[in-house]
Amino acid sequence: MSTTEKPQKATQRPDGRFSLGIFAATLIVLALLLGGLLIVANVWTDVQWYSQLKAVRVFWTQWGWAVALGTVGLLLVGGAAYLNLMLSRRREGGSTTGAGEYRQYAEDHPWLARLGLPLAVGAVFGAPLASEWRTYVLWLNRTPFGQSDAQFGKDISFYVFTLPVLHSILGLAVIALAVSVAFACVGHYLYGGVRQEDGSMVLATRARVHFGSLAAIGAILVACYFWLSRYDMLLAENKKFSGASFTDINASLPGITILSLAAVL
């Protein structure tokens, strides 16, 4: 009498890396939910408090400006990251000599590499612009003081309202440039614009043009920094008085002006 034994199904143990990925994703989702609940609770509390004062419009004005500026910062920094990543891609056909494994991963996950990563970088480095909403609102509602400084002949309101906005814009531009350089380096490394040959670093023509353009933008930003530093002198705090000293006006100011012009040239 023959007996037939049913083959037993092999039980596969779950992959450890897969389980760890699920656990990490669960923690991230829970953290996002908790953070969202805290934000909603704080917003609701503030709305109720401002409503009691019959000034809820003030609250929505603050939040509206914060959200708008945060979105602008995110899009500018994220857009700079995306643009430089796309510019570093190899347009002509043929094989590349960059990091093939990483390049293939980026090509297999285009939404993550070309959209998700730039947006994440923009959220981290650009969205904090939202915290400077007061600076921009004050600038939009500025009024002249009717008195000018003795050195540059600018109305005092320029130093109170306009100069902080210019510094904020310059700071955001520097962040965008730093992100651009980082993504350009990564992109050219992936697509063969930057490679090693015989122990030395070789830059393709497109990489040289790309980095040269970024260097030119950096020089312009340096010139802007030196130019704004001229006005910052009048706001300096010295040991005995506030404002620019004799040395600042007669020695430092001409030197900074020359540095600003030299950075552009």
Question: Language-model segments: which ranges?
Answer:
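Contiguous transmembrane helix-bundle modules in multi-pass membrane proteins
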Residues: T3-Q48, L53-K154, L163, H167-L265
